[in-house]
Amino acid sequence: MNWFSRFLDFISPRLCVVCGRRLSPTERSLCSVCQLHLPRTAFQFTPQDNPMAQLFWHLAPIERAAAFIYYQPHSEMARMVYRLKYRNSPDVGEDLGRLMATDFLLAHYFDDIDLLLPVPLTRKRQHQRGYNQSEMLARGISDVTHLPVAAKALKRQVFRESQTHLSRHERQENVDGIFVVTDTEILKGRHVLLIDDICTTGATLTACAKALASIEGIRISVLTLGFTKN
């Protein structure tokens, strides 16, 4: 941290997005204590057969699936995700992406991945928010893995109602057919890693995978920040 950053930190201290404790000069978004106590899933060690991967069985051609942490509404982790999505904090997404990537490299999760493909927002929603939180996660992952981010290869063409209070079947109906591929050439013959913030029923990621599945030679895997533990 340079002198100007230290000065800014003095007049406007950086706080942990989970516990609110003041961060040290070497900490980013999360303090070391909260990083240590994140409810990690360890799904990356069994990427073909874990509770998240099982959501896609017989529904989408997804090779491996994993989430970094378990997510519960109204928890400390939910506060972190809320900050990422709704409090104009793209830097939190990048920091979490770096943290995810560092953990997942140990399990060789990124082996043979060619591209990071963030799940897109609609143009209206991205304009309202100022950024796509999934893209910020992907940018952070890219900083560690040096994998390219294909942020414009997939488009969300319509916005339907929020998924928050819908059943699994309603969620699937809500997202069916809403994603379209805008750059087929960059995806041909590639192993793409779909990046999203939270996986609850897998409906959004399934819809993305279905939109991608017809591309020649494509392989699809997924990685999310959180997985809702039912």
What are these model-derived regions, one by one?
Residues 1-195, 200-230:
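Glycine-rich phosphate/pyrophosphate-handling loop used in enzymes and phosphotransfer proteins
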